[in-house]
Regions:
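Conserved C-terminal guanine-recognition region of P-loop GTPase G domains, centered on the G4
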Residues: 40-57, 77-78
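Inter-motif core of Ras-like GTPase G domains
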Residues: 12-33
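Switch II (G3) loop of P-loop NTPases
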Residues: 1-14
Length: 131
């Protein structure tokens, strides 16, 4: 398993060869409508550029990075992504993640660790089996 954080540079020249070799994608979306729109536009770009199979097999991590995220319509955002990708996992608000620094597993809340394990399980479930 190789992980790469491509940030927002989906059109960067290194992305095409990276996507051609990928078995799966995790698309991270914030919980706001604007953040969800950007993540959805990324999925649309991928589909329009020949990566529809990757989109259908993708997992969206719906990151509720701030306490205010609870005020938005997370259920509607989640339902939108469920029509486009294989799985959606909500990552709950956690002050350790919100700090934006090094993540220390043992300092995460139990529900955050559970969500991270679920995310990892969904990613592994979608990996192609070598024949």
């Amino acid at each position: 398993v190789v992980l790469t954080d491509c940030g927002t540079g989906i059109v960067h020249s290194v992305m095409r060869p990276t996507l051609q070799r990928a078995n799966g994608l995790v698309i991270v979306s914030g919980g706001s409508v604007d953040e969800a729109r950007l993540a959805s536009e990324t999925l649309t770009w991928l589909e329009a550029n020949g990566y529809g199979d990757l989109v259908r097999n993708a997992v969206v991590a719906l990151n509720t990075a701030t306490q205010a995220t609870q005020l938005v319509k997370l259920d509607e955002i989640e339902q939108h992504f469920k029509t486009r990708v294989r799985q959606v996992v909500r990552i709950p608000y956690d002050p350790s993640l919100a700090a934006g620094s090094v993540i220390k597993w043992d300092q995460l809340k139990k529900q955050t660790r559970t969500a991270a394990r679920l995310l990892a399980a969904h990613v592994v479930d979608g990996l192609a089996v070598a024949e």
